């Protein structure tokens, strides 16, 4: 379910403010049904918001795929606190440097769908050498700053909305 109230978009256990100028990607290939994917009009940035289920810690997940050797870290893994959730984040790029990424994995109490984890994923397409090392700038871009800063874990939000009706 997606529900909009007072400028916030609500999903199963989360809410967000979606700023003007971002495009919803309806046919996104994802692993979780509640995933929302947006991109900028120029297609240079993609952002994915995805609740999911896991038994691993954020450290285990991030270190697991980074150790595969397909990516180069652009930062150390660091602690994050996002919308009432604690986790880990990292900036990295692919080996060919055609994309730079920011990934954040956080945990929350299991919801009624069995989900207990949240992924914030941002991808930056590097088209020229001048585009390199720009992924960290995205965190200060006004549109993404609004969206990222608005992420809130809201348990039982669907039930609360239904009761208000």
Report the location of each language-model feature.
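Short, hydrophobic/aromatic-rich segments at coil-to-beta transitions
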Residues: 2-7, 32-35, 81-91
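Short, surface-exposed beta-strand/loop "edge" segments at domain boundaries and coil↔beta transitions
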Residues: 42-49, 54-58, 97-101, 126-134
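Signature of long, low-cysteine stretches enriched in small and polar/charged residues
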Residues: 63-118, 162-164
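Secretory pathway targeting signatures of secreted, lumenal, and periplasmic proteins
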Residues: 6-68
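Sec/Tat-exported extracytoplasmic proteins
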Residues: 26, 69-70, 152-155
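Residues that act as N-cap/strand-start positions at coil-to-secondary-structure junctions
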Residues: 3, 10, 30-32, 72-74, ...
């Amino acid at each position: 379910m997606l529900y909009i109230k007072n400028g916030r978009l609500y999903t199963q256990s989360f809410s967000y403010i979606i700023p003007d100028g971002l495009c919803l990607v309806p046919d996104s290939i994802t692993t979780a049904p509640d995933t929302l994917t947006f991109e900028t009009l120029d297609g240079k940035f993609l952002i994915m918001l995805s609740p999911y289920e896991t038994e691993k810690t954020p450290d285990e997940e991030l270190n697991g795929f980074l150790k595969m050797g397909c990516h180069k870290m652009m930062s150390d893994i660091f602690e994050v606190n996002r919308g009432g959730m604690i986790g880990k984040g990292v900036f990295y790029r692919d080996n060919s440097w055609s994309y730079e990424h920011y990934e954040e994995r956080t945990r929350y109490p299991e919801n009624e769908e069995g989900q207990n984890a949240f992924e914030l994923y941002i991808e930056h397409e590097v088209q020229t050498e001048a585009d390199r090392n720009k992924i960290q700038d995205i965190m200060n871009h006004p549109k993404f700053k609004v969206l990222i800063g608005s992420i809130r874990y809201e348990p039982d939000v669907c039930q609360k909305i239904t009761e208000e009706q």
